[in-house]
């Protein structure tokens, strides 16, 4: 009997076999003995671990795999030929429980010979390796103990659903308990919850999921509330943030206003419509400065809820509109992070308050510490501090220009030049206090103690200005005495002594000697640079020159030399008192040779009067008048030693001597030169009409 297997129950093609089966179907089904025997093997077949192992052959270890493969393949609707390959070729004995009801079944259908032949064939199939009957596979599909159930379809399929080995694509047993839906009880918060949503019954109030929530208090099915908080420092408020469609919508904690701009952006509204709606709001707060998610137009809570309901985004923005939104933030699952955020917010507030209160005290303490700083680093300290600090520690600013008391005549603080140490900024500040420190003990120069020569100060006549850099001390000591009558400040007293006299070979000093005050320590240039020479040409009544420490060494030398030459007929070098110190050190040649080059360089740097005679105002007329008081003839001077100011106004230049043609003369002498009278004749040689306008201007 060949049959075509299919997914449904296989058909029996022999019509003479169907009739007897149909006549005895109810008899077999309603027999109590058959039912009791059917249920007993079923319970045993469901649990193969309870099967007696003695019924299996020890030589066939593949019995379970083959049985499972046969039952599995029939359940899945596979044809017999395909499943036959899964069976073990070695025959093996079948369990005895599958044949224990065979005698009763044969007695019930003994009137039908064909039925009696079919049933043994089904059970002898594994032993005889005859797999040609599709009916046998369907019988075994129902169960290993039911052979005729294919003819009785009234039995439910639940009796054979659970198979112990659901392999090879078999379906898992059906689960009778349904999947849990949204519950009405607030669950224990857990970060590992596998539910689709974390219901919040405390805020949902058992609202039906099918209706649209217009209050914003109920969580939509399947949505988990996500709230973040940030501290808005500019506004001083905590903001709750809910993200929807990639847009962060914020709500303030203090007044519960909501960022309407971000709210309408979630709705996908165009910019023009959004701005028009927000501009029409009566109560709004425009924020243009701050984080991007906080910028926009903030509107009240009620208006924001109305916009959300109109745009159908209320559920999308959950839990933005929940009244007690802070409770969601304070949920136990977020307690750690929430406490950290709130603690940071409180800490910032406390720091701001404490900072405002402690600010004056910080400023006061800062000012209290200022006097303790060394005067070498604070250039505007009073002179008293400068003298006191100098007594113990040499400072680079206060005594940098004060030379050491040794023969090397080098600046005290090494690489720092006197030009930087003795800045002219301190002149005006310190010269007002000059007289306060001239007669007191604070005016003593502490250098005599530092350099270990306390007895090197001889008693000399008071000097006019003793504020000289290191290289000019020995040279200009006498010259400064010649300028005493022009000093504006009083120099009398022991404090006017030259502090440079304790060089090697110095005379014994008096015990009452008082060195000069600190004002002489601020000479800007040490070696008579061009800048100081130019200032030396300015008159004594200049603001910067009227002070005793404003005179430059080279400038004073030139001015005083010209004044003293009226009574002397010597050469360029003055008398020995001008260049010889009281201790006998003759320093004239060094000073003279040094000033030669300085004055010559300054002549090239000093601006000359231009073609216009008005530029003569650049020179100081009073200085020239003082220079011209002398009647010394011009040939007596050396061109290399005389400044150009004396050349320009010398009376010897009235005839323009030819001995000075190699020098660049000022424009004033060129303008009055007799070699230019031919200029007007040049214009008369041409017709006036043909002369250009620029040439006519010369006439």
Curated annotation (Swiss-Prot):
Compositional bias per record (Polar residues), positions renumbered to this chain: 52-61, 376-423, 520-529, 566-594
Single GO term (MF): sequence-specific DNA binding
Domain HTH APSES-type: 226-332
Record keywords: Conidiation, DNA-binding, Nucleus, Sporulation, Transcription, Transcription regulation, Virulence
UniProt-listed GO biological process terms: conidium formation; positive regulation of transcription by RNA polymerase II; sporulation resulting in formation of a cellular spore
Biased composition (Acidic residues): 75-84
Knockout-associated phenotype: Does not develop perithecia and sexual ascospores, and lacks conidiophores and phialides. Greatly reduces pathogenicity on wheat heads and production of secondary metabolites such as deoxynivalenol (DON) and 15-acetyldeoxynivalenol (15ADON). Leads to up-regulation of cell-cycle genes which promoters are highly enriched in StuA-response elements (StRE).
GO cellular component: nucleus
Compartments, record wording: Nucleus
Pfam families: KilA-N
Region (Disordered): 1-20, 31-97, 372-594, 599-618, 674-699
Chain intervals with Basic and acidic residues compositional bias: 428-438, 478-491, 535-545
Comp. bias intervals (Low complexity): 32-49
Function in brief: Transcription factor that regulates asexual reproduction. Binds the StuA-response elements (StRE) with the consensus sequence 5'-(A/T)CGCG(T/A)N(A/C)-3' at the promoters of target genes. Controls the expression of the gene clusters involved in the production of deoxynivalenol (DON) and 15-acetyldeoxynivalenol (15ADON). Regulates the expression of genes involved in chitin and glucan metabolism. Also controls catalase activity and cell surface hydrophobicity. Plays an important role in pathogenicity.
Family of the protein in this entry: Belongs to the EFG1/PHD1/stuA family.
Protein name: Cell pattern formation-associated protein StuA
Source species: Gibberella zeae (strain ATCC MYA-4620 / CBS 123657 / FGSC 9075 / NRRL 31084 / PH-1)
